[in-house]
Amino acid sequence: MGVPTPARRARLTFGALLAVPTLLLGGCTVSPPPAPQSTETTETTPPPPPKAPTQIIMAIDSIGPGFNPHLLSDQSPVNAAIASLVLPSSFRPVPDPTSPTGSRWELDTTLLESAEVTNENPFTVTYKIRPEAQWTDNAPIAADDYWYLWRQMVSQPGVVDPAGYDLITGVQSVEGGKQAVVTFSQPYPAWRELFNDILPAHIVKDIPGGFGAGLARAMPVTGGQFRVETIDPQRDEILLARNDRFWSVPAKPDLVLFRRGGAPAALADSIRNGDTQVAQVHGGAATFAQLSAIPDVRTARIVTPRVMQLTLRAQQPKLADPQVRKAILGLIDVDLLASVGAGDDNTVTLAQAQVRSPSDPGYVPTAPPAMTRDDALELLRDAGYVSEPVPPPDNTADDPPPDNGRERIVKDGVPLTIVLGVASNDPTSVAVANTAADQLRNVGIDASVLALDPVALYGDALVNNRVDAVVGWRQAGGDLATVLASRYGCRALEATPVATAVPGPATTTSQAPTTTTTTTPPATTTPTPTAPIPAPESGELVQAPSNITGICDRSIQPRIDAALDGTDDIADVIQAVEPRLWNMATVLPILQDTTIVAAGPSVQNVSLTGAVPVGIVGDAGDWTKTK
């Protein structure tokens, strides 16, 4: 083969250059897709619609006066229910007929890893909070919340039976706030009933109204299985939603709606049609029979955790004589007041003991026989009171007013006047107070009703003696020794400075604080003036009086103390002190609130026999809607 000439080499080189792009283009060409096998058009399946939230509707009478479970003025069945579902608790009540109150308190392991007595001298309880426990705003549930609740229960007037909190000398925060070390001035066997329905301290302390009034119509932050979505006072509705930030087992229902059930016929139709699944309402025999007749609907009657009382304030000079107090209470028809307090056609559960409530397993009526009107008026005459005709009003008309025979009871020319104080946000208590005043006016006592804001009623009105008596609810289902000490004890008579172990929550030390004892007033049987409570901003912790009767019986105080520290059996103590409490004639128990509960066939896991403090909603997180 010969060597190419220059012309031939040029032609070969040019041809090679033309071939390279052709090869490169051929190597980058994408293969065409396979031929379609069918000419039919493929339709895209739309995603399934979102699942509708599971909502369980519970019928109620009203949403109640407020949502702070620790205030006397806010006690209601709905408040107890809401608190148990949205607020964290150290312990939860479960039914136990062998206990003095019918409930046993078990550790809530969703909030606490443990809670135990870690020292006997001083008596100390250590609460270990789960690290993941948090409020719905992401703030941790911590020892600061325990500290805040203790301080409020000691210093605020009008709280629920605070004798246990009054024994605390310090709450210390350790382990970054996830341990609360609580020291007491003495042993307290009922410590498991403290620090339940815990409030978010970082929210409540700053909202308008604070602890005493800030939760009247709102629950902005919660820490339970549910959170409060909306509260509509006008429609009497509360909507709870599952708390997606809850760190333990989530609630099964997405939503629980508490709403007004309406008239018995409307409620029956709603349950019959499946619009309402659960109900807790007041009603009589007709309502109960109407609901019970609906196929597959379960019904029962349960008592709620509140008892209504009328309390006379014996430190008022006109009420210092026990015979006068006995006469006033003897002139009141308790059966009538109970009927008014129970509502139209509702079954009445009379309360006829000073310490125990009708729901307590050991309850027996201890009330003395009812006094006749003549006997009561005789007691007033023995105390120096007389009846005289009511002077006619100034009348310039020609015709004098008719003589209706009305008389008034006076002493030294001064009429006997009684001002009944009542919380203005509680229409039931207002109605009972008005009826009691009517009864007293009918016999010549100048009785009137003063409806006040709850903060003013239990604070300024008691301190400045603006009221002679208080009509309202007390909590039922709690520790009996604590009830006895809170309502009748000499230690609970006056505003008393509290010596505390630490000034506030500490977060850097793990050493338990040393304990100092609380200063207590001397026991007395004479009326005791109520001292003013220092302003909260003063920083001083002062125990507010919870015994609003104004007197105590020092002869039974050692038994009260022994019951509180567990060295004396509470049943024996109650048996010994009940006659003396009745003889003091300061507290007139009226009734324990009773409701009808019903559950329809479309909801499962609803127990109609829950523990008294929480009622039937204690297990609402497990309720399941079947259709």
Curated annotation (Swiss-Prot):
InterPro entries: SBP_5, SBP_5_dom. GO terms for biological process: glycolipid biosynthetic process; peptide transport; phosphatidylinositol metabolic process; phospholipid biosynthetic process. Pathway: Phospholipid metabolism; phosphatidylinositol metabolism. The keyword Lipid biosynthesis applies. One of its GO terms (cellular component) is membrane. GO terms for molecular function: peptide transmembrane transporter activity. Keywords: Lipid biosynthesis, Lipid metabolism, Phospholipid biosynthesis, Phospholipid metabolism, Signal, Virulence. Residues 501-528 have a biased composition (Low complexity). Residues 29-52, 385-407, 501-540 are annotated as: Disordered. It comes from the Bacteria. SUPFAM superfamilies: Periplasmic binding protein-like II. Residues 1-27 form the signal peptide. May directly or indirectly regulate the accessibility of the key branch point intermediate, monoacyl phosphatidylinositol tetramannoside (AcPIM4), to the elongating alpha-1,6 mannosyltransferases which could regulate the lipoarabinomannans (LAMs) biosynthesis. Belongs to the bacterial solute-binding protein 5 family. This is Probable monoacyl phosphatidylinositol tetramannoside-binding protein LpqW. The lineage of its organism: Bacteria, Bacillati, Actinomycetota, Actinomycetes, Mycobacteriales.
